[in-house]
């Protein structure tokens, strides 16, 4: 990458570039720099305009190197099988067209709930080189993003769903892949039921969450249960694709990350009947809110949630 700096009264400039397994610090009298950064990932750039070594002004910003790597490198990560023994593929979107297929997806617009900051807009979702690209922007504190669902266009009861995605992980980001009961418009939440296939709350520990929500008819209160998987390197969630899956039947839901099981929850109880009905698919990137907290100076904008495919299978 090439960087040019300028500042009135500066005698020289310095830039420090840091990322996973990478660090480079250079000085320049004319403010021109060149860095050869090959690993994909997120980098922090710190630029200083010096009068003397200890008298300077400083500017920091973040670079998501995924935006400029090759197509081959961009697609790195786990890929799930196209088929499974004993299952039929009943619905899929490979995002291979020039635009989002509106026979599959609805665009939700407006402000969301959970004290989130973003305004959902259709314009923040598009197809880019065979991937769904959901963009979270934060220009001047005016946060925008996108949320898509398949309500009234596709829903299913029981089976397996695989979603291959690359998600943003900086502070305040809340990417989610989830299912909501098709009865939502008639009986509202949580009576309709909710199955969260994947949520990431922009936290530093790399926890990928799976959760279910329902209305407990025995006590009239909301029911919640779930768990999480700690990944070894949270930056890989944004630099590599992973496949987020559940296998769901009338008795239990099993969560998988890259086809490795990490969570099981039983749903056969009488008061959990809404978790055994038809559900539709939702993909979204929220910003801020009750779970991830608000963005800060380390947050990366624009942030991208890329989805390679969504595939739904049911037993023969």
Model regions and ranges:
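Short beta-strand segments within Ig-like beta-sandwich modules, predominantly Fibronectin type-III
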Residues: 22-29
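Short, solvent-exposed loop/turn segments at the edges of extracellular beta-sandwich modules
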Residues: 50-56
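GH16 jelly-roll
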Residues: 1, 12, 35, 40-49, ...
């Amino acid at each position: 990458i090439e960087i040019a700096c300028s500042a009135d009264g500066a005698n020289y400039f310095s830039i420090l570039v840091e990322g996973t397994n990478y660090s480079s610090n250079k000085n320049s009298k004319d403010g021109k720099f060149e860095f050869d950064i090959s690993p994909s990932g997120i980098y922090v750039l710190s630029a200083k305009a010096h009068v003397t070594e200890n008298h300077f002004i400083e500017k920091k910003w973040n670079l998501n190197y995924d935006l400029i790597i090759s197509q081959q490198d961009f697609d790195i990560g786990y890929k799930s099988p196209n088929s499974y023994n004993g299952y039929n593929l009943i619905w899929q979107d490979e995002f291979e067209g020039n635009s989002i297929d509106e026979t599959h997806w609805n665009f939700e617009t407006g402000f969301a709930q959970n004290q989130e900051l973003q305004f959902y807009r259709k314009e923040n979702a598009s197809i880019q080189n065979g991937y769904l690209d959901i963009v979270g922007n934060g220009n001047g504190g005016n946060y925008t993003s996108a949320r898509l669902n398949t309500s009234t266009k596709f829903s299913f009861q029981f089976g397996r769903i695989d979603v291959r995605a690359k998600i943003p992980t900086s502070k305040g980001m809340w990417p989610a892949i989830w299912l909501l009961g098709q009865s939502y418009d008639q009986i509202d939440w949580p009576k309709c039921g909710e199955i969260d296939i994947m949520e990431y709350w922009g936290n530093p520990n790399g926890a990928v969450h799976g959760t279910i929500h329902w209305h407990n008819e025995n006590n009239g209160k909301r029911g919640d249960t779930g768990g999480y998987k700690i990944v070894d390197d949270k930056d890989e969630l944004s630099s590599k694709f992973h496949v987020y899956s559940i296998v769901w039947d009338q008795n239990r839901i099993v969560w998988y990350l890259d086809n490795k099981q990490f969570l099981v929850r039983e749903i056969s109880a009488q008061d959990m009947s809404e978790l055994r009905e038809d559900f539709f698919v939702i993909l979204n990137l929220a910003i801020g809110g009750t779970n991830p907290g608000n963005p800060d100076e380390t947050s990366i904008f624009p942030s991208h949630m890329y989805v390679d495919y969504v595939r739904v299978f049911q037993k023969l």
